Amino acid sequence: MKVIEGGFPAPNAKIAIVISRFNSFINESLLSGAIDTLKRHGQVSEDNITVVRCPGAVELPLVAQRVAKTGKFDAIVSLGSVIRGGTPHFDYVCSEMNKGLAQVSLEFSIPVAFGVLTVDTIDQAIERAGTKAGNKGAEAALSALEMINVLSEIDS
């Protein structure tokens, strides 16, 4: 029986991080966690990491699609945070963003790691951006690294 599993080291990988500016006080912590993880666990050179900023979470799928279309990257890490308010806007944003990012991954056959917080409160966002509940940006970076290696193994 052959089992395919990906590790984390991917020293030659080219990674794009697409990040929304809205709620930047949270997102910058996610970005720090992602970059640290790519460098420490993935052994990815800083020269091979490109950060692309966009206004908000709704724009992430289009930016990810354009990045994927270039063919220059082995994976995309999407980062942002959507915090529930008093209207149904949260549900629409989260649903469409999630669908859009998944579509990019399938359309271009590239890992698009999901590091976008979808939370009810600012406190929950803070907890998931590097305090009590870990750093979801770092976790998304690990997922991207592992998927690069899994897909490489499948293709070899």
UniProtKB/Swiss-Prot annotation:
GO CC terms in record: cytosol; riboflavin synthase complex
Gene3D superfamilies: Lumazine/riboflavin synthase
Matching Pfam families: DMRL_synthase (PF00885)
CDD domains: Lumazine_synthase-I
Positions annotated to bind (2S)-2-hydroxy-3-oxobutyl phosphate: 86-87, 128
Enzyme class (EC, first level): transferase
Entry keyword set: Riboflavin biosynthesis, Transferase
InterPro entries linked to this entry: LS, LS/RS, LS/RS_sf
UniProt EC number: 2.5.1.78
Protein name, as recorded: 6,7-dimethyl-8-ribityllumazine synthase
Species for this entry: Vibrio vulnificus (strain YJ016)
Gene, per the UniProt record: ribH
